[in-house]
Swiss-Prot record:
Taxonomy, superkingdom: Bacteria
Region: Required for resistance of nitrosative stress but not persistence or toxic effects, residue numbers: 70-158
CDD domains on file: COQ10p_like
One Pfam match: Polyketide_cyc
Family: Belongs to the ribosome association toxin RatA family.
Subunit structure: Associates with 50S ribosomes.
Organism: Escherichia coli O6:H1 (strain CFT073 / ATCC 700928 / UPEC)
Protein name, UniProt field: Persistence and stress-resistance toxin PasT
Misc. comment: This strain of E.coli has only 6 recognizable intact TA systems, whereas E.coli MG1655 strain K12 has at least 16. This may explain in part the differences between the 2 strains.
Gene null: resulting phenotype: Deletion of the pasT-pasI operon yields a defective infection of mouse kidney but not bladder. On rich medium operon deletion decreases bacterial persistence after antibiotic exposure about 100-fold. Forms small colonies on rich medium. Delays growth on minimal medium supplemented with threonine, increased sensitivity to oxidative and nitrosative stress. Growth defects are complemented by low levels of PasT expression.
Length: 158
């Protein structure tokens, strides 16, 4: 009985990913990199395509294609944009029952900021989670590092 209860508890806990980094770039610079969805395939590991479906000053709907080890999926999010401060994502379409999260950019000085990335997600079913779960978790867990490396490439060249 205890094993069964433990199994049920494991089933209802959604995977969460949280990453934080202190970077020698402004909040504005980091916000611009993260909000530049169309450039994702150039530097995000596993990202094979991205497109903006709708865009207004405070909101963007974008689709991102991810592929790894022969497994490909597309997901679409609606992003609430607070310029140079935060990007809040919510699921529109994709292999998830739930996907919410976002980015927060906190200035530390003119040339440094703290970036925070948080994601809560749950796949639509166990089969999709078995096929794609590890790939997606790995991609999501490496997002902050990928953007930090990208910032160095883009802003150190100036």
């Amino acid at each position: 009985m205890i094993l069964f209860v433990g199994f049920l508890l494991m089933e209802i806990v959604m995977p969460q990913i949280s990453r934080t980094a202190l970077v020698p770039y402004s909040a504005e610079q980091m916000y611009q990199l993260v909000n530049d969805v169309q450039s994702y395939p150039q530097f995000l590991p596993g990202c094979t395509g991205s497109r903006i479906l709708e865009s207004t000053p405070g909101q963007m709907t974008a689709a991102v294609d991810v592929s790894k080890a022969g497994i490909s999926k597309t997901f679409t999010t609606r992003n609430q944009l607070t310029s140079n401060q935060s990007i809040l994502m919510s699921l529109v379409d994709g292999p998830f029952k739930k996907l919410i999260g976002g980015w927060k950019f906190t200035p530390l000085s003119q040339d440094a900021c703290r970036i925070e990335f948080h994601l809560d997600f749950e796949f639509t079913n166990k089969l999709i989670e078995l096929a794609f779960g590890r790939v997606f978790k790995e991609l999501a867990a490496n997002m902050v590092q990928a953007f930090t490396v990208r910032a160095k490439e883009v802003y150190s060249a100036r």
